[in-house]
Design a protein with these regions (language model features):
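Ala/Thr-enriched low-complexity intrinsically disordered regions
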Residues: 2-6
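Charged, alpha-helix-forming regions
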Residues: 8, 12-282
């Protein structure tokens, strides 16, 4: 029986999820295999792809349009904790139905490090701060059906830390969960990789709103809607020119520089804001 070749000391095998371009990695690996494995011995490089796909799949965000359109403000740490919960809710391979989603989520420091590329000490502080901010904050939903036009509720029912284990268990308010998993079948989806370089929650929320209409590339809204849903400060609420100068235009510049979208906007005669955008890959 043929002996399998050993990997030379000078060859380094990196984790697949560190490669932005898996095809480049597989091509390099194929060259190494061709030079080092004995004739007749083959290596299935395709077997390495699921790990990459799984990692990227779990870095995808899928949130209900009710959440995209909700009024809330969270600090960046809390927004990231919310992302980790949404990833668990929608990309659990064992989950068959959205109705199976429980309000309990485990938030680990190690996951925060992996997805947001920060040191463990920073992640530990961020997770604690994020969970605390969620626990102290409320969110306002605007259901299209039902008795109420606005529903304001606290995010969480409970949060508990496991000391020494680097993890938190949080329980969402059971009345909030239907809005998270979707009262309808309409969702906003995007990749965490696409907006990971945005460090302003209000800019992130603008990006999420654009992604809601990604299929058409057109979104029409108003100054009042942006101020209400993104909880913009009074100076921007009271002066549309100030809002454009200090929020909207800098936000679109960041989105154009750091995400896959290319966005422009115009102001209609009636004051509405018309956004046109497309994916840069198109």
């Amino acid at each position: 029986m043929a002996n399998f070749a050993t990997v030379p000391d000078k060859v380094q095998i990196f984790p697949v999820d560190k490669y932005r371009d898996s095809l480049q990695f597989l091509f390099s690996l194929s060259l190494w295999v061709g030079k080092n494995l004995p004739i007749g011995i083959e290596m299935d490089t395709q077997a390495l792809l699921p790990a990459t796909k799984t990692f990227k799949k779990r870095a995808s965000i899928k949130q209900s349009n009710e959440l995209t359109e909700a009024a809330y403000y969270l600090p960046l740490q809390a927004k990231r904790v919310l992302w980790l919960c949404l990833m668990q809710a929608y990309f659990n391979d064992s989950q068959e139905d959205d109705s199976d989603v429980l309000p309990l989520f485990k938030i680990s420091v190690s996951d925060y490090v992996k997805y947001f590329n920060v040191a463990t000490s920073v992640a530990s502080r961020d997770v604690k701060a994020g969970v605390n901010a969620l626990g102290e904050s409320t969110v306002t939903f605007y259901p299209k059906e039902g008795e109420f036009e606005e529903v304001k509720r606290p995010w969480l029912a409970e949060a508990g830390m496991k000391r020494g284990r680097g993890s938190w268990q949080i329980e969402f308010n059971y009345k909030v969960m239907p809005f998270l998993v979707g009262l309808t079948s309409q969702f906003t989806t995007y990749s965490l990789y696409d907006c990971g370089q945005l460090n302003s929650v209000r800019v992130i929320r603008l990006y999420e709103s654009l992604c809601q209409f990604r299929s058409t590339g057109v979104w029409i809204t108003t100054h009042d809607w942006l101020c209400e849903r993104f909880m913009l400060p009074a100076s921007q609420k009271n002066n549309i020119a100030e809002m454009k100068r200090t929020f909207l235009e800098p936000a679109l510049k960041k989105i154009n520089e750091k995400t896959p979208l290319k966005v422009t906007y115009t102001t209609e005669e009636d004051g509405r804001l018309l956004f046109n955008f497309l994916d840069k890959k198109q």
